[in-house]
C-alpha cells in the first residue's frame, strides 16, 4: 500500500532529512515512527502528502509512483489521507460539529451525508455530548479528539499522525491512543512520535530513525 524505495531528502546546506530509506507498509498496518527531533519522522509524512519532494528514490501509494513526473493526482492523493498534526488548525467561531464537518463541506458533500459522517465520527472519538460546544470550552485532549474526528470522516483510509499526543499529559495521551486502536481494523495508521511510553503500550510495528536513517524495524508482540 505504501512503499519507500531508497528515498533520500537532502537540503541545500547538505544535511540529510532522510538518507536512503526503504520500507513497505501494508493495508491496515499500524506503524510507529520513532526517534529524536530531526530524525526524519515528519519528513516521511510530508513526502507522502507531497508537501516536499525527495532528492532521490521512489514513493508508492496504492501501487502508484507519486514521485513520478507522470503523477498528476496530488489533490486526490491528499484526500485519501486523514492528517493529525500537533498544531492542527481549528476555527474558534465554529462548534465541534461544524469544525469536523468543514473537511466534508470543502468536498461539496451533501448535508445529509455530512451529518451521518460527523455523527459517526463523534461517537468514535467520544465527543457526541460536546458537538455543540465551541473550542474555547474544550480541553487540550478534547481538541485533539476533534482533530482525529476531522481526519477520519469522508472515508479516508490512511491516517497520518505527527506527534498527536505531544502536548498532552500521560493519561490523556493514553486515551487518545485508545481511539487510534479502535480504528486499526479499518484504517492504515502511521504515527510519528518521540513518546516512547505510548509506543511501548502498544504491540505494534516500530520503525526507529536516527539522523535520517532507519536503525531498527521491529514488529512487537
PLM region spans:
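Conserved ABC transporter NBD signature motif
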Residues: 57-65
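Helix-to-loop junction immediately C-terminal to a conserved catalytic motif
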Residues: 49
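Conserved ABC ATPase signature
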Residues: 134-144
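A short, flexible loop at the N-terminus of ABC-type nucleotide-binding domains that lies
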Residues: 1-4, 9-20, 70
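Conserved signature/switch motifs of ABC ATPase nucleotide-binding domains
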Residues: 133-136, 154-155, 185
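Catalytic Walker B motif of ABC-type/P-loop ATPase nucleotide-binding domains
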Residues: 159-162
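ABC ATPase NBD coupling module
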Residues: 66-82, 183-184
Amino acid at each position: 500500500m505504501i512503499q519507500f524505495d531508497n528515498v533520500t531528502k537532502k537540503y541545500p546546506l547538505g544535511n540529510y532529512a532522510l538518507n536512503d530509506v526503504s520500507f513497505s507498509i501494508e493495508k491496515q498496518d499500524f506503524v510507529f515512527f520513532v526517534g529524536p527531533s530531526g530524525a526524519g519522522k515528519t519528513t516521511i509524512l510530508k513526502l507522502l502528502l507531497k508537501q516536499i519532494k525527495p532528492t532521490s528514490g521512489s514513493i508508492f501509494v496504492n501501487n502508484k509512483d507519486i514521485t513520478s513526473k507522470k503523477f498528476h493526482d496530488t489533490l486526490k492523493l491528499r484526500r485519501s489521507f486523514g492528517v493529525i498534526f500537533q498544531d492542527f488548525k481549528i476555527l474558534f467561531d465554529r462548534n465541534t460539529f461544524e469544525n469536523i464537518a468543514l473537511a466534508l463541506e470543502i468536498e461539496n458533500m451533501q448535508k445529509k451525508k455530512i451529518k451521518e459522517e460527523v455523527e459517526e465520527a463523534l461517537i468514535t472519538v467520544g465527543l457526541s455530548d460536546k458537538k455543540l460546544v465551541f473550542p474555547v470550552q474544550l480541553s487540550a485532549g478534547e481538541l485533539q479528539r476533534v482533530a482525529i474526528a476531522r481526519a477520519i470522516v469522508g472515508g479516508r483510509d490512511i491516517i497520518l499522525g505527527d506527534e498527536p499526543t505531544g502536548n498532552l499529559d500521560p493519561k490523556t495521551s493514553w486515551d487518545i491512543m485508545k481511539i487510534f486502536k479502535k480504528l486499526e481494523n479499518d484504517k492504515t495508521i502511521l504515527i510519528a512520535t518521540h513518546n516512547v511510553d505510548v509506543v511501548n503500550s502498544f504491540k505494534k510495528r516500530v520503525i526507529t530513525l536516527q539522523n535520517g536513517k532507519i536503525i531498527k524495524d521491529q514488529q512487537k508482540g
